[in-house]
């Protein structure tokens, strides 16, 4: 393997920085906009920041792009068994610990919102509770079902011993998905041609360009993924206005999606890709448990104790609390899983 190829597969601090941007975008959306709009925190009203926080949900789109970027480089040389093992240890231990923590805290009797049932907990342990007609223990966890869909697709490719073709698969995936979308065939609701996969394939193609260079077809595919992602996200504006509250701007959504693509394309700049950022690796790793624990527990605290007078202090306190819980979860997970994950820990990416 050439030195350039080895260098392109090293962990990139800039990507971890983007993970931090993504997670705090999502947190701002949940606390400053979504919880208020849905009446989960009735004693707290919108703030001047809410108009911008309402677009923080697009941090999930950035996470999807990062997933594609990382996957095309990390999975190609793995066997089916290696991939399943790494993904299992990446997702499930932290998820189970987070569920137990959320269940325990949410079950305390003094919260305004009733705690979850044991049945909800059991089905959530699968990471796809809606398949059994159950709701998510934490509504923010819906993202994980899409991740599992993605991993199932990759595992099938590896099971067929076609990992070396992942680059071509992602490239064609973007082109076919774009055509499928704009021809209106998406009404068949095929999972893997959902708009979220526009972002996954876009991230993967950027990873391919970084590793192997530009080609005409990769540029066409990247453009296709961008157009697919842009229109599929912007077209949700009416749904957003009806279900999350009025005032969503198609222009702002489009600008954010464009910014996400540009931020990912910056990984092609050698100086940025090699930029050492102190603490970035830890912060990037922490983004996953932080995503898992922040929403329901933070919402409970704000609903119970939040007022117009203390809301900004409480937001800061809740974020600090979530970071502390996430740090503890990460340490506990490493202690429990260290006998099993010594070889795979370096592969921790989202």
Q: Where are the regions a protein language model picked out?
A:
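Alpha-helical transmembrane segments
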Residues: 18-27, 97, 169-176, 222-226
């Amino acid at each position: 393997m050439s030195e350039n190829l080895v260098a392109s597969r090293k962990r990139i601090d800039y990507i971890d920085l983007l993970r931090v941007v993504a997670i705090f975008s999502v947190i701002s959306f949940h606390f400053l906009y979504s919880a208020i709009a849905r009446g989960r925190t009735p004693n707290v009203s919108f703030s001047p920041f809410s108009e911008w926080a309402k677009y923080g949900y697009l941090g999930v789109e950035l996470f999807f792009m990062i997933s594609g970027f990382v996957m095309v480089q990390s999975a190609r040389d793995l066997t089916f068994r290696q991939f399943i093992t790494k993904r299992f240890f990446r997702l499930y231990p932290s998820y189970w610990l987070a569920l137990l923590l959320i269940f325990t805290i949410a079950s305390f009797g003094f919260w305004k919102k009733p705690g979850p049932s044991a049945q909800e907990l059991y089905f959530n342990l699968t990471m796809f509770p809606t398949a059994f007609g159950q709701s998510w223990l934490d509504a923010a966890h819906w993202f994980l079902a899409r991740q599992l869909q993605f991993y199932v697709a990759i595992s099938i490719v590896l099971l067929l011993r076609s990992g070396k073709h992942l680059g071509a698969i992602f490239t064609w995936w973007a082109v076919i998905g774009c055509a499928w979308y704009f021809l209106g065939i998406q009404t068949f609701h095929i999972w893997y041609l959902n708009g979220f996969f526009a972002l996954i394939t876009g991230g993967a193609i950027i990873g391919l360009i970084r590793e192997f260079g530009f080609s005409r077809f990769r540029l066409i595919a990247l453009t296709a993924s961008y157009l697919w992602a842009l229109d599929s996200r912007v077209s949700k504006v009416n749904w957003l206005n009806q279900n999350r509250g009025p005032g969503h701007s198609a222009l702002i959504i489009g600008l954010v999606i464009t910014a996400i693509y540009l931020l990912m394309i910056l990984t092609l700049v050698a100086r940025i890709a090699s930029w050492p950022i102190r603490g970035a690796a830890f912060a990037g790793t922490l983004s996953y448990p932080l995503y898992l624990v922040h929403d329901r527990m933070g919402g409970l605290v704000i609903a119970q104790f939040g007022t117009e007078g203390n809301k900004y202090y409480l937001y800061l306190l809740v974020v600090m609390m979530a970071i502390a819980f996430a740090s503890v979860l990460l340490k506990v997970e490493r202690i429990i899983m260290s006998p099993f994950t010594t070889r795979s820990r370096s592969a921790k990416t989202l």
